[in-house]
Amino acid sequence: MPRRKQEQPKRLPSHVSRQEEAEGELSEGEHWYGNSSETPSEASYGEVQENYKLSLEDRIQEQSTSPDTSLGSTTPSSHTLELVALDSEVLRDSLQCQDHLSPGVSSLCDDDPGSNKPLSSNLRRLLEAGSLKLDAAATANGRVESPVNVGSNLSFSPPSHHAQQLSVLARKLAEKQEQNDQYTPSNRFIWNQGKWLPNSTTTCSLSPDSAILKLKAAANAVLQDKSLTRTEETMRFESFSSPFSSQSASSTLAALSKKVSERSLTPGQEHPPPASSFLSLASMTSSAALLKEVAARAAGSLLAEKSSLLPEDPLPPPPSEKKPEKVTPPPPPPPPPPPPPPPQSLELLLLPVPKGRVSKPSNSASEEESGKPFQCPICGLVIKRKSYWKRHMVIHTGLKSHQCPLCPFRCARKDNLKSHMKVHQHQDRGETFQCQLCPFTSSRHFSLKLHMRCHQHFLRTEAKVKEEIPDPDVKGSPHLSDSACLGQQREGGGTELVGTMMTSNTPERTSQGGAGVSPLLVKEEPKEDNGLPTSFTLNAADRPANHTKLKDPSEYVANSASALFSQDISVKMASDFLMKLSAANQKEPMNLNFKVKEEPKEGESLSTTLPRSSYVFSPESEVSAPGVSEDALKPQEGKGSVLRRDVSVKAASELLMKLSAESYKETQMVKIKEEPMEVDIQDSHVSISPSRNVGYSTLIGREKTEPLQKMPEGRVPPERNLFSQDISVKMASELLFQLSEKVSKEHNHTKENTIRTTTSPFFSEDTFRQSPFTSNSKELLPSDSVLHGRISAPETEKIVLEAGNGLPSWKFNDQLFPCDVCGKVFGRQQTLSRHLSLHTEERKYKCHLCPYAAKCRANLNQHLTVHSVKLVSTDTEDIVSAVTSEGSDGKKHPYYYSCHVCGFETELNVQFVSHMSLHVDKEQWMFSICCTACDFVTMEEAEIKTHIGTKHTGEDRKTPSESNSPSSSSLSALSDSANSKDDSDGSQKNKGGNNLLVISVMPGSQPSLNSEEKPEKGFECVFCNFVCKTKNMFERHLQIHLITRMFECDVCHKFMKTPEQLLEHKKCHTVPTGGLNSGQW
C-alpha cells in the first residue's frame, strides 16, 4: 500500500488528459491513504468526484499546476481549489482566488527535490508554510484573510511563539504517522463540554476527523448567528469564543494528540459523510496531517484574536490557510470563497473573508460620520455633512417638513420658514406697504420695491411708503418720528396709508393743516373735501370709515372732474395724453410746492367771490375773478374747469379713472357731459349758489370753496386730489377703451350739431386744438375773446402777472394741444399749428418714383431714402418744380434719358439717377440719352451736348444737364469729370438755379451749392447716404465714387477699377472683329 501511495501521483501529471486523471482518481480513491478503512475524508473525496465533473477539475488544474511542479504538490493543490467551487454562485470568485493560490502553493512545493516522497511529507511542508503564511497575514494586516487573498507575494514574517509550539507538535504527529503507515483508530473520542471524552463503544466512538466535524458544526452555528446580526446592523466582528478560545484550542489539540498516540492498527468502522460533506485538504491526507492542519489554524485563530484587540483592526477571526468551503447560506453577501461547512478551524478561516467584506460598510459608515463625504444615491452628488445631505435629499423627495403655524405655508428649509415668519411679524405690528399706483399691498418693504418696477411709466420712489408717514399727524402727533409715524400708519391696517389720496374734512384735519405739517400732509388734507361737497350723498363724516379705499362708484362721481372728458377725443389722443401723463407723473413731486402756494390766492379770492370760484382751477384764472363780473365768468365755468385746470399728470389720470364712474352716476347726479353745457348756456346770467348741486361747475365750486375756507392762510392743500383711487395699468387700458367707444359715438353725434353752434369752449374749433387742461390763460385768450368777448387780452395778461406775483406759473410743456382732426396731442401750440396744415394744405412734394406725395420737404426727403436718393437743394421751389414737371416741359429740354431695362424716360437728371439706382449694378448702365428734336441716341452726355450745339443751334433752350454737374447728370459723367477739369469747371456754373444734386466732381474742385455754401444738413452725397459738414470731407468721400468709376467701358459703360481690367474687359467687345481697340477708350 505504501508503494501504491507513492506511485499514485505519477498518474496525475498536468499534461495528462483530464478524463484519465478523473478515472484514476475514482478507481483508486479507496486505497489512497494506504488503509482499508473508509474514513470521512475518503468518502468526501469520492463524493467530490461524483458531484463535480471533470470539466471543473480541468479548469482548476490548468490554473494551479504547471509541468514543472512536483506531482506530490499538484494533487492537493488542485483538489483544494476544486473544492472551493462547490457553490455555483461563488464559482467565479473561487476561480479568481485559485489563480492567486496556485502559484503560492506551487512555489512552496517546487523547492522540494524529492517529489517521490510520501504525500504526508509534502503535505507537512505545505501546512508549515501555510501556518507561516497565516501568521504573517495576521500580524501584517490585523485581520483574517484566507490564503486565497494573501497571494504568492506575501512576505513571511516569523510566527509567534505559540504558533511555533503548535507547529512542532504538528511535526511530531506527522513523523509518527510516517512510522505507522497503516493505522486504524481503535478508540473514539466524543467532544463534550469542551473536552474530548473517550467512548467505550467502537461503533459510536469518534475519530479525530469526526471530532473535528463536530467542532466545525459548532463553529458554523456561531458564525451563522454572527453573520445574521452583521446584516442587520454593522458592528465590529469579534473572535469566536467557542470552540477555539485560548483554552479550548489547546485542550482540543492535546486531546487529539493523545488520541493519535493511542490509535490502534485495526481498521475502524466507517462513518457516513455528513449532510454537508467536509471537503478540505484533510480529505486527501491522513488524520495526523489533519491534526497538523488544525494546529496551524488554531495558531492563526489565536493570532487573529490578539490582532482584534488592536484599535486599528476592527476585522474578524482567526486566519487559516484553508480554502473556503461551502458556507451555510448566511444573509450577508457571500464572499468569493464560501464553500460547504468545514471543520471548526476551517470555517473560522472562511468567514473572515466574508466578515471582512461585510465589515467594510460598518467601517465606511463610521468614517462617514467622522467626516467622510456622503453621496446622494439619486443624482450622485457628494456632500460633506450629513445635515447637508438630508437637506439635499428634500430636492428629490419633495418633502416640506416645516409648517408655518399661522398659515398654510410649508417649506423644506428652516431658514425659509424664518424669513416667512417675518411677514406675520409685520402683520402683527400692523405694518403694511401699499403701492400708490395700484391696489398692491405687501407686508415687506422690499416686496413693494420690487413691485414698483412694474410701473415703468409712473413715478418710482422707494420712499413712497415713507412719504405717507405724515398720516399719523392727522391723529394729532405731527412731531412723531418717521419710524413712529410709519408704525402708526400701518396699525390702521393701511387706512392711513391711503390718506394721501383721500382724507376726511374733519376739524382734526384742518387743525393739523395749520400745525405746520409737511407738504405731503397738506396734500392729503383737502383731498376728501375736494372730492366730496357737503351737499353730496357721500358725507365727509362717512369718509374716514371707508377712506382705506375709494373704489365706490359714487366716490368716483363725487369728483366731478370726470366731466373734463365730456368733449370728444379719439383713442389716439387719449393714448398720447396718457403718455404725457406718465411723463409728468415723474415731475409731480417737484410741483407740490407750487400747488400749495397757489391755493392761498384761491382762498382769499373765493372768500370775496364764492360764485366765481366754482370754475376756477388755475391760480391765474382765480386771481382775475375780482375784476370780472359774475355774468362774464359764468359761461366760462365749465370751460375754465376743463381748459384752465392745471394737469400735472396725476390729475389727468384721476380724471381718466373717474370716467369709469359715469355708468354709476345715474342715481346721484345728472349726466355730467350734458349738464354743464345747459347750465353754462341757460343760467349764465344767474348767480349760482355754492350750496346748489346742479351741475359740474357748481360741484367744482363746492370743491374749491369749502375746503379752502377751512384752510389757514399759511397752508393750502393741493388744488385736486391726485390719484385718489389706485388704478392699475389694466384698469387704465379698460377705461381708455370705454372712453374711445363713448368718444367715437358722441363725436359723430355732436360734431355737426354742437361743435359749430354752441358757445361752449369745449367745442370751439380753436380752443379744441388746445389742451383742455391748459393752465396758461394766454393760450386760451384768443378763443375766449372770440367766443364770448367778455375777457380781454389785457385782463388775461394781468391775470398771468398776478398769478406770477410770488407764485411761479405753470410751464408750457405741461400743456397738451390735441388735434381735432386726428386726435393727436402736442405739447406746443406751434407744433399743433404746423400739424394742422397737413390736414388742409395741398401735398405738393411728390415722389418721382412712386405715387407718394408730401406736404413738406422733410417728409419727402425722408421718403426718398427708401429709393436711395436724397434731395439736397435748399430751394423748395426748385425741388417742387423739378419733381412736378410734366412731359409737356419736354419742349424746354433738348434731350431726355431713357432706361433700357424698364423703359423709364425723363428729362430730369435727378430722377433718372435715382431711378437707375433701383436697378442691379449690371443694369445701372443700360440706358441712353435721346435727342428730342431728332432720333440721335448716345450714351455720353458730352456727345448729346455736341449734337445739340451743332445740329440744333437755332433752338435757344436750356437743358437741365447744362445747369447740373456732369457727375450728377449721369453716373457715367464721373469718369469724364475726373479726366477733364475743363468740363467740371464749366459744369459748376449756376445757370438755372435748378440743381437738385450737388457734388464735387474733381478732387481739386470745390463743390458748389446752388443757393447756399453749406446746406442745413451739411453736404450730402447723391450716390449714397453720406452726409458731412465740411467740403474737404465731402471731396474726399467723392473720390470713392470717382475712383471706382474711373475706368469705364465706352461700349457697355461698365466701370473697371484698373486700366488692366478695362483692357481685358474690352476684349469681349472686339473679339468678333478680330482686333483689339484697347487703346481707344
Swiss-Prot record:
GO terms for cellular component: chromatin; chromosome, telomeric region; nucleus; ribonucleoprotein complex. The lineage of its organism: Eukaryota, Metazoa, Chordata, Craniata, Vertebrata. There is a cross-link at K673 (Glycyl lysine isopeptide (Lys-Gly) (interchain with G-Cter in SUMO1)). Changing P9A: Decreased interaction with RBBP4. Changing K5 to A/R: Decreased interaction with RBBP4. It comes from Homo sapiens. As part of a ribonucleoprotein complex composed at least of HNRNPK, HNRNPL and the circular RNA circZNF827 that nucleates the complex on chromatin, may negatively regulate the transcription of genes involved in neuronal differentiation. Could also recruit the nucleosome remodeling and histone deacetylase/NuRD complex to telomeric regions of chromosomes to regulate chromatin remodeling as part of telomere maintenance. Residues 961-978 have a biased composition (Low complexity). PANTHER family: ZINC FINGER PROTEIN (PTHR24403), ZINC FINGER PROTEIN 827 (PTHR24403:SF62). Residues 1-14 are annotated as: Mediates direct interaction with RBBP4. Belongs to the krueppel C2H2-type zinc-finger protein family. There is a cross-link at residues 176, 216, 226, 360, 372, 466, 475, 523, 549, 580, 587, 597, 634, 639, 658, 673, 704, 710, 742, 778, 798, 870, 891, 958, 1014 (Glycyl lysine isopeptide (Lys-Gly) (interchain with G-Cter in SUMO2)). This is Zinc finger protein 827. Part of a transcription inhibitory ribonucleoprotein complex composed at least of the circular RNA circZNF827, HNRNPK and HNRNPL. Interacts with the nucleosome remodeling and histone deacetylase/NuRD complex. Interacts with RBBP4; the interaction is direct and recruits RBBP4, a component of the NuRD complex, to telomeres.
